[in-house]
C-alpha cells in the first residue's frame, strides 16, 4: 500500500515555467593555496539556497532549492524552468533535498528526490519520485508524484535529516540515508530507521536480502550507528562509500559494509559540543572505524566519486563539498583504503558536488542569491 498522501506528499505542487553562508576565512593548514588550484572556475548561474544537483542523460541539470523548487537547467545555464514547487518543511536543516534520475530515466523519465515534512509525532525525511513530462507549452513538468518511503519514527526537531540517494550499480535497488535527527540513541535502535543506511527496492519497499532483518532490525536497514549522512556514492568496483558529519570533530568517510555498526553515538573521533568526551574508535570495540576522519571538521556536504577523463589523475577519487570549511576536498580511494588528498579553499560553503558528462566537476554553493552559485571546474 502506498503511504498516505496527506501524511507524506507535499500538499502543493505547481508545474510551471539553509543555511546562511559562513564568512570566508583564511585557508587552514594543509589546504592548497588558491594559486595552486589545478582547475578553472566558471560561474554558470545562481540559485536561492540550492541543495543538490544531478545530470540527466541529455546533459540538462536538475537542481533542488531548499524552499521546495525543483529547477531544470540547460547545460549552458541560460535556460531554466521550475518543473515543480513542493510544499516542504523548511525549518532548520529541512527542505527539498537530494535529487537523482532513475537508472532507466531514458525510458521511464522518473526522478527520485527527498524532502522533510511534518507528520504524526513530529518531522521526518521522505523518499519520493515523479515523472518528467511535456507540459504542453514547450517545457516540462514533474508529474505523477508519489511518496515511496518515510523515516521511522518522526520526531521533533529540525536537524540531521540526511536524505541522500544512491542507486545500486545494477539499477535494481537504491540506498537512502536517514540521519539520527540529533537524538543520538536512534542510531543504535534496531527498530528505528534513523541513523542508518537503508537499502530499498525502486518502489521504496525493503530490498530482499538485507543483512539485519533476521536479527530483529527494521527490514530496510543495511548499516547502522550513523550520525548525519550527507553523501553516499558507489565507486567503479561497486563499493559503497559514505561521508557524515561528526560532532565537534570527527567528520568521517566510511566504506559501507552490510550489517556493520559504525558506532555513533558510542564511538566517534570527535567530542560532544559541550566538551564531553566520546570514546574514540579503537580496535576490538565492535564498531567499524572510518577510513578517513577530520579534526578540525570540514563539515562534509555532497559526495561524488570521479570517473571522468578531464582530470585523469583523479579517476576513482572521492570529492566532498566542505560547508564550514568552505572548501572542495579530495580523498584518494585505493581499493578498500582511503587517505586525505587535496583541500582547495573555495570562499563559500559547498553544498553539493557532481560530475558533468564531459568530466568537468560541478559545485553548488550553500546560500542565497550570488552565494548559491552553480560553478563548473575545468582543467587548466
Where are these regions (language model features)?
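Repeat-solenoid scaffold signature
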Residues: 217-252, 257
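Acidic, Gly/Ser/Thr-rich repeat motifs that build Ca2+-stabilized beta-propeller blades
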Residues: 16-184, 231, 239-242, 246, ...
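Conserved blade-ending motifs and adjacent loop-strand segments that build the rim/top face
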Residues: 226, 337-357
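Beta-propeller blade signature
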Residues: 125-135, 190-203, 256-257
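Short, conserved, GDST-rich strand-edge loop motifs in beta-rich repeat architectures
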Residues: 117, 176-194, 250-256
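Aromatic-anchored helix/helix-loop segment that forms the rim or "lid"
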Residues: 282-297, 301
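Bacterial N-terminal signal peptides
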Residues: 4-15
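Blade/loop signatures of beta-propeller domains
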Residues: 20-40, 136-142, 205-214, 266-286
Amino acid at each position: 500500500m502506498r503511504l498516505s498522501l496527506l501524511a507524506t506528499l507535499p500538499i502543493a505542487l505547481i508545474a510551471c515555467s539553509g543555511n546562511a553562508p559562513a564568512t570566508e576565512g583564511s585557508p587552514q593548514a594543509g589546504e592548497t593555496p588558491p594559486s595552486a588550484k589545478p582547475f578553472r572556475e566558471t560561474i554558470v548561474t545562481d540559485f536561492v539556497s540550492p541543495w543538490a544537483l544531478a545530470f540527466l542523460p541529455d546533459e540538462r541539470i536538475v537542481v533542488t532549492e531548499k524552499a521546495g523548487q525543483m529547477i531544470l537547467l540547460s547545460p549552458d545555464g541560460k535556460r531554466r524552468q521550475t518543473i515543480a514547487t513542493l510544499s516542504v518543511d523548511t525549518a532548520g536543516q529541512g527542505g527539498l533535498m537530494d535529487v537523482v534520475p532513475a537508472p532507466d530515466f531514458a525510458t521511464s523519465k522518473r526522478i527520485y528526490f527527498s524532502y522533510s515534512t511534518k507528520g504524526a509525532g513530529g518531522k521526518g525525511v521522505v523518499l519520493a519520485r515523479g515523472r518528467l513530462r511535456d507540459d504542453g507549452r514547450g517545457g516540462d513538468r514533474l508529474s505523477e508524484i508519489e511518496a515511496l518511503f518515510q523515516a521511522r519514527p518522526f520526531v521533533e526537531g529540525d536537524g540531521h535529516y540526511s536524505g541522500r540517494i544512491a542507486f545500486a550499480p545494477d539499477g535494481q535497488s537504491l540506498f537512502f540515508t536517514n540521519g539520527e535527527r540529533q537524538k543520538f540513541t536512534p542510531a543504535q535502535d534496531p527498530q528505528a530507521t534513523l541513523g542508518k543506511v537503508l537499502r530499498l527496492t525502486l518502489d521504496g519497499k525493503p530490498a530482499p536480502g538485507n543483512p539485519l532483518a533476521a536479527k530483529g532490525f527494521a527490514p530496510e536497514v543495511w548499516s547502522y550507528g550513523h550520525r548525519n549522512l550527507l553523501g553516499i556514492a558507489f565507486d567503479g568496483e561497486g563499493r559503497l562509500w559514505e561521508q557524515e558529519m561528526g560532532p565537534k570533530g570527527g567528520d568521517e568517510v566510511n566504506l559501507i559494509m552490510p550489517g556493520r555498526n559504525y558506532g555513533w553515538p558510542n564511538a566517534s573521533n570527535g567530542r560532544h559540543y559541550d566538551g564531553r568526551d566520546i570514546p574514540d574508535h579503537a580496535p576490538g570495540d565492535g564498531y567499524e572505524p572510518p577510513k578517513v576522519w577530520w579534526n578540525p571538521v570540514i563539515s562534509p556536504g555532497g559526495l561524488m566519486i570521479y570517473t571522468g577523463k578531464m582530470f585523469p589523475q583523479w579517476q576513482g577519487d572521492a570529492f566532498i563539498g566542505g560547508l564550514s570549511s568552505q572548501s572542495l576536498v579530495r580523498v584518494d580511494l585505493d581499493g578498500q583504503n582511503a587517505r586525505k588528498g587535496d583541500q582547495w579553499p573555495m570562499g563559500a560553503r559547498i553544498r553539493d558536488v557532481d560530475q558533468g558528462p564531459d568530466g568537468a566537476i560541478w559545485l553548488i554553493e550553500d546560500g542565497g542569491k550570488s552565494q548559491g552559485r552553480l560553478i563548473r571546474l575545468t582543467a587548466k
